[in-house]
């Protein structure tokens, strides 16, 4: 990987991310009407002390992949304002992606309502967590933006958060460490009760859930308890054997990201033809190379 190229990519990404996040709480131009339609459709209460926090991850997952392809072009444009304008016109979620993430988010909401009837959502006022800043190593910006997110939640009197993806959960864990973020949060996977599911899958572990958040065993217990069969191979799905989907490196090198995803898909499908994931970015990266389902698509 060319060092100068990576540095140029990094500078472009930093410029775009920081400006968009500080101004609009999202990393890239996003149609929030589309991103929140899942909640309008089922009349999720607005606000409240306990909220489901999407951080727009399912809504943006496939859009992230599209942005990665345009980063070299954006790098030659210079102005983040120009980048944002062009990005908003070039990059929009496909109808099938919208339908899919709406169904997933609605199912997750129905699942968590079994443990608490009073769960709201911030709709268009929801902030992105800032996970990209942390994962790309922009630590000063991560802390600064994290304080804005923390303050926004406090303004909305949020006292309990339900996260739905590993990147957001890991980000809040690190905000707790770095800026004293003290609002309790729980992954929705830990709240699943009396769920039913079908199918036979090999599980692609989220690096964050399994390695950093200690959920390797609990996720498997949840899936199996719902009636879904998991096929294991210790050399592929063992606690120390899994490897990245390639997503995190995508903003810096889309080609390398795809090579990693293809290699991971090949090892997974050597165990079972159908793959299960617990992360929207893992889905976006792997689905080009194998048949993938999200946990929230196979249990309810």
Across the structure, where does each feature detected by a protein language model lie?
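A short, acidic, amphipathic alpha-helical segment used as a generic capping/interface helix at domain edges
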Residues: 150, 256-273
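Short, flexible loop segments at boundaries between secondary-structure elements
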Residues: 181-201, 234-243, 290-300
């Amino acid at each position: 990987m060319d060092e100068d190229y990576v540095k140029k990519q990094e500078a472009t990404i930093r410029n775009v991310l920081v400006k968009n996040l500080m101004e609009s709480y999202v990393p890239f131009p996003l149609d929030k009407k589309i991103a929140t339609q899942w909640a309008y459709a089922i009349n999720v209460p607005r606000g409240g002390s306990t909220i489901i926090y999407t951080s727009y991850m399912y809504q943006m997952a496939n859009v992230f992949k599209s942005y990665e392809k345009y980063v070299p072009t954006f790098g030659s444009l210079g102005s983040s304002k120009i980048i944002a304008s062009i990005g908003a016109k070039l990059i929009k979620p496909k109808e099938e992606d919208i339908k899919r993430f709406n169904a997933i988010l609605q199912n997750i909401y129905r699942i968590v309502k079994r443990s608490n009837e009073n769960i709201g959502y911030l709709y268009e006022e929801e902030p992105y967590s800032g996970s990209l800043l942390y994962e790309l190593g922009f630590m000063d910006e991560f802390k600064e933006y994290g304080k804005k997110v923390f303050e926004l939640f406090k303004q909305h009197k949020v006292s309990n958060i339900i996260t739905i993806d590993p990147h957001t959960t890991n980000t809040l864990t690190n905000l707790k460490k770095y800026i004293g973020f003290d609002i309790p949060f729980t992954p929705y996977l830990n709240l699943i009760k009396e769920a039913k599911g079908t199918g036979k899958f090999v599980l692609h572990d989220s690096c964050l859930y399994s390695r950093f958040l200690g959920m390797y065993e609990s996720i498997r217990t949840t899936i199996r308890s719902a009636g879904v069969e998991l096929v294991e191979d210790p050399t592929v799905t063992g606690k120390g054997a899994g490897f990245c989907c390639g997503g995190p490196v995508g903003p810096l090198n889309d080609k390398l990201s795809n090579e990693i995803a293809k290699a991971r898909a090949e090892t997974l499908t050597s165990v079972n033809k159908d793959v299960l994931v617990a992360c929207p970015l893992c889905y976006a990266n792997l689905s080009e190379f194998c048949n993938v389902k999200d946990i929230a698509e196979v249990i309810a």
